[in-house]
């Protein structure tokens, strides 16, 4: 009964986070475009989309972690669970290392990739954003293993509450940047800061 209640509340918090995120994007995007300008916003969006593909390196392992942690907890098999977690941490370390290597290669290829579509100044901005966003994705990938483990222990309320809090934190920081100093670099830094605090 307790687990069912945990799941229901967790699901409710998850839907709330998704709805809030959609509202924030819908509300903030016009202001971000206005403050950054069409060209800088274009580079900002391009780098977010371009680096977004790096998240595929996670290979959907989160679902596997949740399933096996739940299984070993139900069986009270702590020895196997600890061995499994050791392997998972090793895999995620290699994934993070792979992301960093790919990011370094892509960084030095940005001139060739975008020379035909972006100006020199835009490429410089793209490189700065690429470093920040790549660091965010690396941290998010590392953090996802802890989120999956927490869900595996069926602490759905806690894990979804963390997502909700980070969504609110992201919104507040974005609002602050838009008011004080709206730049593409600072907007990207918000994701990095939130990724770091959520680990």
Question: Each PLM stretch: what is its role?
Answer:
Residues 1-24, 79-86, 90:
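N-terminal membrane topogenesis motif
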Residues 18, 160-199:
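Hydrophobic alpha-helical transmembrane segments
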Residues 105-108, 118-143, 160, 188-189, ...:
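Alpha-helical transmembrane segments of multi-pass membrane proteins
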Residues 4-8, 137-165, 175, 185:
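Membrane-interface junctions at transmembrane-helix termini in multi-pass inner-membrane proteins
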Residues 25-40, 112-118, 180-181:
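Helix-terminus/linker motif at the lipid-water interface of multi-pass membrane proteins
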Residues 89-115, 172-179:
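Alpha-helical transmembrane segments of multi-pass membrane transport and lipid-handling proteins
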Residues 32-55, 84, 184-189:
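Interfacial/gating helices of multi-pass transporter permease domains
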Residues 22, 45-73, 93, 99, ...:
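Small-residue-rich midsections of specific transmembrane alpha-helices
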């Amino acid at each position: 009964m307790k687990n069912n209640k945990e799941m229901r509340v967790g699901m409710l918090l998850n839907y709330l986070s998704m709805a809030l995120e959609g509202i924030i994007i819908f509300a903030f995007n016009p202001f971000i475009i206005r403050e950054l300008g069409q060209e800088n916003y274009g580079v900002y969006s391009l780098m977010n989309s371009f680096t977004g593909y790096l998240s595929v390196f996670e290979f959907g392992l989160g679902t596997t972690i949740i399933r096996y942690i739940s299984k070993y907890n139900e069986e009270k098999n702590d020895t196997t669970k600890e061995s499994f977690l050791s392997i998972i941490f090793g895999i995620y370390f290699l994934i993070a290392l792979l992301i960093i290597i790919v990011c370094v290669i892509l960084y030095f290829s940005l001139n060739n990739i975008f020379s035909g579509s972006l100006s020199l100044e835009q490429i410089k901005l793209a490189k700065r954003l690429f470093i920040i966003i790549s660091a965010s994705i690396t941290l998010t990938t590392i953090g996802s293993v802890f989120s999956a483990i927490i869900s595996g222990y069926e602490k759905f309320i806690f894990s979804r509450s963390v997502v909700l809090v980070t969504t609110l934190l992201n919104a507040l920081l974005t609002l602050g940047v838009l008011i004080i100093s709206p730049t593409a670099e600072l907007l990207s830094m918000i994701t990095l800061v939130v990724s770091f605090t959520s680990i």
